[in-house]
Amino acid sequence: MNRFKEQAMKIVFMVAACASVLAVFLICLFLFANGIPAIAKIGPLKFLLGTVWKPSNDKFGIFPMIIASIYVTGGAILVGVPIALFTSVFMARYCPKKIYRPLKSGIELMAGVPSIVYGFFGLVLMVPLIRNTFGGTGTSWLAASLLLGIMILPTIIGPTESALRSVSESYYEGSLALGATKERSIFVVMLPAAKSGILAAVVLGIGRAISETMAVIMVAGNQARMPAGLLKGLRTMTANIVTEMGYATGLHREALIATGVVLFVFILIINLSLSLLNRRSENAN
């Protein structure tokens, strides 16, 4: 009976694994089957490096959206990673038990807040603040980066804290025994030891930021042109897809799917690059 249960569970696990792989494969197949022909029709250089997006004139250049996605994601990482890192260090090494539970619950709650709620927060509070402080409309690259920096905090904090807690306590105690201060022991010994977990958390944060749509649409200005400055509006690749997919037909629709292909490849390259970097650093150590 036990042997039968073991075999049954193996089959269940195998089916679940195959279903997951099949789902990813079908998504990739749909994207590439519909997107690659569109890129071929438009022309790879015109599509990837074109600076004008006017579907009514058969102009499908997504270079401004690619740059906007990089700018917004980069800004979010600059805002979110330092805050998340210091928060993780505080929770793992400094936080009193009475504070830890509500703080942990609050961060987990942040992860479950819908994107549209963050978008309303940015639209009602951040955009007017930027407009009154720096001028302009307020909907801008700055607003999108700040908002995404807040949104990726729980995505980075959780894995980073776990990575810090997984480091052997002997590293910390050995550093203290050699005369290092508590802060130096954490930032010079503990953080490098947890580097692989921290890099994984940053990758998750980048994926979260670059794939975000609704919140970005609400605060970024949604302007399909080359980003002109920190206080100017822009449109990311995800925003471009969501904004126009509802009414797009023909080559226009295919070009939007092709934008999804570019976004998919973009995230894949980031993940592979950081994984390779992490592997090289581990081999060096």
Enumerate the language-model features and the residues they cover.
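C-terminal transmembrane helix and the adjacent membrane-cytosol boundary/short C-terminal tail
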Residues: E161-R165, E169, L176, V203, ...
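Periplasmic/extracellular loop-to-transmembrane helix junction in inner-membrane transport proteins
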Residues: M1-Q7, I11, A33-A76, P96-K97, ...
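Generic hydrophobic transmembrane alpha-helix motif, especially the helices
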Residues: E108-L148
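Transmembrane alpha-helices
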Residues: P159-T160, K182-M218
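Interhelical loop and adjacent transmembrane-helix boundary motif
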Residues: V216-L263
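Loop-to-helix entry region at the N-terminal start of transmembrane alpha-helices
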Residues: K59-T73, R131-T155
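Amphipathic cytosolic juxtamembrane alpha-helices at the membrane-cytosol interface
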Residues: E6, P96-R101, S168-E169, E173-A200
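Cytoplasmic-entry segments and transmembrane alpha-helices of multi-pass inner-membrane transporters
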Residues: K10, I83-G122, N285
